[in-house]
Amino acid sequence: MAKLTKDELIEAFKEMTLIELSEFVKEFEEVFDVTAAAPVAAVAAAPGAEGGAAAEEKDEFDVVLEDAGAKKIGVIKVVREIVSGLGLKEAKELVEGAPKAILEGASKDDAEAAKTKLEEAGAKVSLK
């Protein structure tokens, strides 16, 4: 098997959907017995590191779909609006797999707008 360069891997990842990337990460974690989560010590040290900096507002948010509610079809439509390039099948799998992150690293305005749209469609959503 030919060895792929970093650039070739990045290009391959660019062509994958959000769900395909999520499945890849899960399989990668299982095969290599690692986790993609940030170390707890690094996360715990950050808030106390600069006293006043902890009071600053977060500028990146994850929009997490906690539950689709009774109106799944409406929620699926909104998910397709929010996540560009997502097909009907992928959006359905994402909604049915709740709780799942819909957007990651979104600005406050984008995260709030997505949360509002999803809640109007009947979903339970949280920002992290």
Curated annotation (Swiss-Prot):
Pfam families linked: Ribosomal_L12 (PF00542), Ribosomal_L12_N (PF16320)
Transmembrane residue ranges: none
Keyword terms of this UniProt record: Ribonucleoprotein, Ribosomal protein
One biological process term in Gene Ontology: translation
Gene Ontology MF term list: mRNA binding; structural constituent of ribosome
HAMAP family: Ribosomal_bL12
Oligomer and partners: Homodimer. Part of the ribosomal stalk of the 50S ribosomal subunit. Forms a multimeric L10(L12)X complex, where L10 forms an elongated spine to which 2 to 4 L12 dimers bind in a sequential fashion. Binds GTP-bound translation factors.
Family membership noted in the UniProt record: Belongs to the bacterial ribosomal protein bL12 family.
NCBIfam families assigned to the protein according to its UniProt record, in alphabetical order: L12
Role: Forms part of the ribosomal stalk which helps the ribosome interact with GTP-bound translation factors. Is thus essential for accurate translation.
Protein's name according to its UniProt entry: Large ribosomal subunit protein bL12
Organism this protein belongs to: Corynebacterium jeikeium (strain K411)
